Curated annotation (Swiss-Prot):
Job description of the protein: Binds directly to 23S rRNA. The L1 stalk is quite mobile in the ribosome, and is involved in E site tRNA release. Protein L1 is also a translational repressor protein, it controls the translation of the L11 operon by binding to its mRNA.
CDD domains: Ribosomal_L1 (cd00403)
The protein, known as: Large ribosomal subunit protein uL1
Family: Belongs to the universal ribosomal protein uL1 family.
Gene: rplA
Record keywords, A-Z: Repressor, Ribonucleoprotein, Ribosomal protein, RNA-binding, rRNA-binding, Translation regulation, tRNA-binding
Keyword Cytoplasm: no
Biological processes, Gene Ontology terms: regulation of translation; translation
Gene Ontology CC annotations of this record: cytosolic large ribosomal subunit
InterPro entries tied to this protein: Ribosom_uL1_bac-type, Ribosomal_uL1, Ribosomal_uL1-like, Ribosomal_uL1/biogenesis, Ribosomal_uL1_3-a/b-sand, Ribosomal_uL1_CS
GO molecular function ontology, one term from the record: tRNA binding
Assembly and interaction partners: Part of the 50S ribosomal subunit.
Phylogenetic classification of the source organism: Bacteria, Pseudomonadati, Pseudomonadota, Alphaproteobacteria, Hyphomicrobiales
Keyword Hydrolase listed: no
Length: 230
């Protein structure tokens, strides 16, 4: 079946104007996840912020209680004992100057990037390469740290970085279609709680304005914003 026809069929029974309680929305999304692979369940949250202003940026990291269902490759910039610690914690790629050179040459073989503070003068040169991919280590989200073990295990264990993009939209993968409805609800509520705690001082009016959930190949289902909290 062509993708367009499949999506149209999946939209059947979804009222595009209605706001559904979170649990009901998740049930509908799961029922419509019919691809031949385990689709990712994604949430999109429209926030009452303008990320063009520094005092309205929303960014953070949260460990989802039920993981993401995705196996991440973790890269660590570290030397000596910290490099050994990263390897022992399960990092997939570890290095210093050698890893910087690989990245500069276009070899980026990781989905999450961590660095010890002493490596940042070197890693800073990679801003134009790592930045656009959302991979630049940042102390605010715990990816510039001396706790290499904690950062690697967190990334491997289901931590999700979130960041508001243009137009005030924040998007994140919160699990797989194979997850139970209960686990997906728990993950979304954990993300919503972290996003709420990250509310910037510059945000005025309603903070969480609109919410929708979807699967990789399925239609979006609008959610009552109040049902993703608590």
């Amino acid at each position: 079946m062509a993708i367009g026809k499949r999506l149209n069929k999946a939209r059947e029974g979804v009222d595009r104007e209605k706001l559904y309680p979170l649990a009901e929305a998740i049930k509908m999304v799961k029922e419509r996840a019919k691809a031949k692979f385990d689709e990712t369940i994604e949430v999109a949250i429209n926030l009452g912020v303008d990320p063009r202003h520094a005092d309205q940026m929303v960014r953070g990291v949260v460990t989802l209680p039920n993981g993401t269902g995705r196996t991440l490759r973790v890269g660590v910039f570290a030397r000596g004992a910290k490099a050994d610690e990263a390897k022992a914690a399960g990092a997939d790629v570890v290095g210093a100057e050698d890893l910087v050179e690989k990245v500069q040459n276009g070899s980026i073989d990781f989905d999450r990037c961590i660095a010890t503070p002493d490596m940042m003068p070197l890693v800073g040169r990679l801003g134009k390469v790592l930045g656009p991919r959302g991979l630049m280590p940042n102390p605010k989200i715990g990816t510039v740290t001396m706790d290499v073990t904690g950062a690697v295990k967190g990334a491997k264990g289901g931590s999700v970085e979130f960041r508001v993009e243009k137009a005030g939209i924040l998007q994140a993968g919160v699990g797989k279609a194979s997850f139970s409805e209960e686990k997906l609800v728990e993950n979304i509520k954990a993300l919503a709680d972290a996003v709420s705690k990250a509310k910037p001082a510059g945000s005025k009016g309603t903070y969480i304005q609109r919410v929708a959930v979807s699967s990789t190949m399925g239609p979006g289902v609008k959610v009552e914003p109040g049902t993703i909290l608590g």
